[in-house]
A protein has these predicted regions:
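N-terminal secretory/targeting leader peptides
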Residues: 2-141, 153, 158-369
Length: 369
């Protein structure tokens, strides 16, 4: 078992067994995690049936992003004996995927099943809680989130927008991009129009790519019509479902921009405060278990998907070390520039950077390369 695999398994298991120990942050309680307003709850005696809507950024048929949300819905219903019902809605059924943040913040939607990376234009710092270019593997990522202050900062930021959120699914490394032609150098990327997500989009822009943030279900039409020249979205098994192979025959790895990705379950803070403590902890526990399940499924499902993708005439490529070095250099420039412009962003980056420096001592000693 190599280092990244072992770290992923350990991280997933750690998240799955943290029952009743943490309430949205390590070593504390929700009131500590929310720096604005007071997180409260009702007693079991006051408990009534709760019916909430959960618009999703991912269709129910999509592995992990969608199926993880449906599993969450079912687990909550069963474990609450039908007292807490959170109904999953496909993208567009209630809201367009990129409007979930505003709707939950305003109370127009109770909850959302999505990714904090979609809010890059609203709150740049939230991108750290979805995926980090050249960032940590799964074990290190959840260690920072649950024990290094990451989750506490996530809660503090969201609370200022009348939202409370937590990671609720996790995926292994993604593909780096689908292209119509073989990319032989970084220079050939310049001028391309490409769908790109999160902080990685800033890196691509730094090297001359024009990026757009497009929700998953809208990517294929944009690629097919030529609105974009290339795209990235997720792991092979999820990309396969979206049909990118029909248009682009060159698929690149590794996913330097998303070595591990977190998805979130977000709740309007007023609605959250109306829940009993039992229902709050039920949600916390189901999310932690869902993190383990989705990560394990994600790792297990990739090889069969890659075989099918190749059978459809797609060539798999791995970026040269020279290209990865250029991208990593661009990332270091981007993150320092963004930190200099946004105090909230700088605070989260400082926490992550410090944690990774300390973790590296343990990682280098404890794990095989």
């Amino acid at each position: 078992m190599n280092k990244s695999t072992l770290m992923g398994v350990v991280g997933g298991l750690a998240v799955g067994i943290l029952v009743g120990t943490f309430v949205f942050q390590s070593g504390g309680n929700q009131q500590d995690a929310v720096d604005h307003g007071e997180v409260s709850g009702v007693s079991p005696a006051q408990e009534t049936v709760v019916n909430w809507s959960m618009p999703s950024s991912f269709p129910a048929t999509m592995l992990i992003g969608g199926t993880g949300g449906k599993d969450f819905e079912e687990n909550i219903r069963i474990l609450s004996n039908g007292m807490l019902n959170i109904k999953f809605f496909d993208p567009g059924a209630l809201l367009p995927p990129l409007e979930i943040f505003d709707a939950v913040s305003a109370g127009a939607a109770n909850t959302g099943w999505t990714s904090s990376g979609y809010w890059a234009g609203k709150v740049p710092a939230l991108q750290f809680f979805s995926a980090i270019p050249f960032g940590p593997g799964a074990g290190e990522y959840v260690a920072w989130m649950y024990h290094g202050g990451g989750l506490q900062m996530m809660q503090e930021i969201y609370a200022r927008h009348n939202v409370i959120s937590q990671p609720c699914f996790m995926t292994p490394p993604e593909g780096s991009g689908w292209f119509r032609f073989e990319v032989k150098s970084v220079d050939e990327l310049k001028g391309l129009k490409m769908r790109f997500f999160g902080l990685g989009a800033k890196v691509m822009e730094k090297i001359g790519v024009s990026t757009q943030l497009i929700a998953g279900g809208d990517i294929f039409p944009a690629l097919e019509l030529g609105t974009i020249d290339a795209t990235e979205f997720a792991m092979p098994v999820m990309d396969l479902d979206l049909g990118f192979h029909e248009v682009a025959k060159h698929y690149y790895f590794p996913g330097w921009h998303q070595p591990t990705s977190l998805g979130e379950f977000m709740v309007n803070l007023d609605d959250w405060n109306s829940l009993s403590d039992t229902h709050k902890e039920l949600i916390n526990t189901v999310c932690r278990a869902n993190m383990m399940r989705t990560f394990a499924l994600g790792d297990a499902a990739q090889f069969p998907a890659l075989k099918e993708i190749q059978a459809k005439g797609v060539t798999l490529h791995r970026w040269s070390q020279e290209t990865l070095d250029v991208l990593e250099g661009a990332w270091h420039e981007v993150v320092e520039e963004m930190a200099s412009e946004d105090e909230e962003f700088a605070k989260v980056w400082a926490s992550l950077k410090s944690f990774r420096e300390e973790y590296k001592v343990w990682g280098d000693l404890g794990y095989l390369d």
